[in-house]
C-alpha cells in the first residue's frame, strides 16, 4: 500500500526522532501499524465524540485521555533521548559515585530510560481509573484498583463485573486480554499470557519501582559468572537488555491507549443509537494548539 509523503519536521533532530518513532511503531496512529510511512507520523488518536447527561463527565473523560496521551509521548521522547544521547550531562558533574568494578551504568541518560519505563507502566492503572469512571463502577476502592482487577467483581477474579459480562465491545476485550500481560499479583495470569516475555517485563518493572535494579555495560561478565564482586542484592541487567524491555513497555502502553480509544468510540456509537438526543449535553471542543504547549 502506497501513501503520499509528508514532512517529518523542520529540523534534522525532529526528523530523526519521528523516523525512529515510525520504525518502532510508536505513534498513536493505526496507520503506523501498516508501516513506517510519513502519513502516520502524528498522534491523531483521540476519544472522538463523548456524550453525557452532564458536561462535567465529558470534560473529565477528554481531559483524562489528553493527560495520558501527553504522558505517553513524553515517555516516548525520554526513551529516545536515553537510547541515543550518550554524551555526559552537566547535571552529573561532580556527583561522587564509587566504582564497584562490575561496569555499572550511572548517568542522566540511563535514568531517562528508567523514567520512560515508569511512565509507560503508570498508564495502565490510570487506564483502569478511566474505565472505572466511564462505566460508573464502584465495586473496587480506588486505592486498590489496577488494570488487572478492574474487570472483576470485588470478591474475586473469577467473575466479571456486570458491566463487562457478555459485553460485545471487541476493543474493550482486547484491552482486557492485554491486561493479562500486566498482572502484578498473580503468577497464573502472567504465565498463561499470550506474551512469552510478560513475566520478565513485569518482574523488571517491579524491581525498578520497588527494589534495586542495576544496569551494566557490555563489558560486564554477566550475572551467572563466578565473581567475588558479585552484587547479590541487585537484580542485574545489561543496559541494552533493559532498553529493549523499556521499549516493549512503551509499545504495550501504546496498544492500551489505542484499545481504550476504540472501546470508548464503540460505546459512544451504541449510546447514540439508544439514547434520546434531548437527554444529551452537546459540547463542542476545539484542539489544543501546538503553540500553547509551553
Where are these regions (language model features)?
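Alpha-helical structural motif
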Residues: 13, 57-60, 64, 71, ...
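Charged alpha-helical initiation segments
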Residues: 1-113, 226, 274-281
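Long alpha-helical rod scaffolds of large eukaryotic non-enzymatic complex subunits
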Residues: 57, 64, 241, 245-294
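Short non-catalytic regulatory patches outside canonical folded cores
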Residues: 98-202, 210-211, 217
Amino acid at each position: 500500500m502506497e501513501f503520499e509523503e509528508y514532512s517529518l519536521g523542520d529540523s534534522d533532530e525532529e526528523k530523526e526522532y519521528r523516523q525512529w518513532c515510525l520504525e518502532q511503531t510508536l505513534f498513536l496512529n493505526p496507520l503506523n501499524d501498516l508501516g513506517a510511512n510519513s502519513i502516520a507520523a502524528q498522534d491523531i488518536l483521540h476519544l472522538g465524540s463523548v456524550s453525557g447527561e452532564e458536561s462535567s463527565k465529558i470534560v473529565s473523560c477528554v481531559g483524562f485521555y489528553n493527560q495520558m496521551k501527553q504522558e505517553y509521548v513524553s515517555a516516548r521522547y525520554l526513551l529516545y533521548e536515553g537510547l541515543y544521547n550518550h554524551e555526559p550531562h552537566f547535571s552529573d558533574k561532580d556527583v561522587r559515585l564509587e566504582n564497584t568494578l562490575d561496569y555499572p551504568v550511572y548517568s542522566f541518560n540511563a535514568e531517562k530510560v528508567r523514567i520512560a519505563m515508569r511512565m509507560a507502566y503508570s498508564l495502565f492503572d490510570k487506564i483502569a481509573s478511566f474505565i472505572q469512571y466511564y462505566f460508573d463502577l464502584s465495586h473496587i476502592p480506588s486505592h486498590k484498583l489496577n488494570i488487572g482487577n478492574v474487570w472483576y467483581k470485588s470478591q474475586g477474579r473469577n467473575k466479571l463485573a456486570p458491566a463487562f459480562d457478555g459485553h460485545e465491545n471487541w476493543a474493550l476485550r482486547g484491552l482486557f486480554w492485554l491486561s493479562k500481560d500486566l498482572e502484578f499479583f498473580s503468577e497464573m495470569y502472567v504465565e498463561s499470557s499470550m506474551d512469552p516475555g510478560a513475566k520478565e517485563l513485569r518482574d523488571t518493572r517491579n524491581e525498578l519501582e520497588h527494589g534495586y535494579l542495576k544496569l551494566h555495560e557490555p563489558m560486564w561478565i554477566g550475572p551467572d559468572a563466578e565473581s567475588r564482586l558479585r552484587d547479590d542484592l541487585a537484580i542485574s541487567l545489561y543496559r541494552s537488555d533493559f532498553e529493549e524491555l523499556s521499549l516493549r513497555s512503551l509499545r504495550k502502553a501504546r496498544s492500551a491507549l489505542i484499545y481504550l480509544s476504540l472501546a470508548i468510540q464503540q460505546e459512544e456509537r451504541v449510546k447514540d443509537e439508544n439514547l434520546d438526543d434531548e437527554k444529551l449535553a452537546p459540547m463542542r471542543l476545539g484542539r489544543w494548539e501546538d503553540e500553547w504547549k509551553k
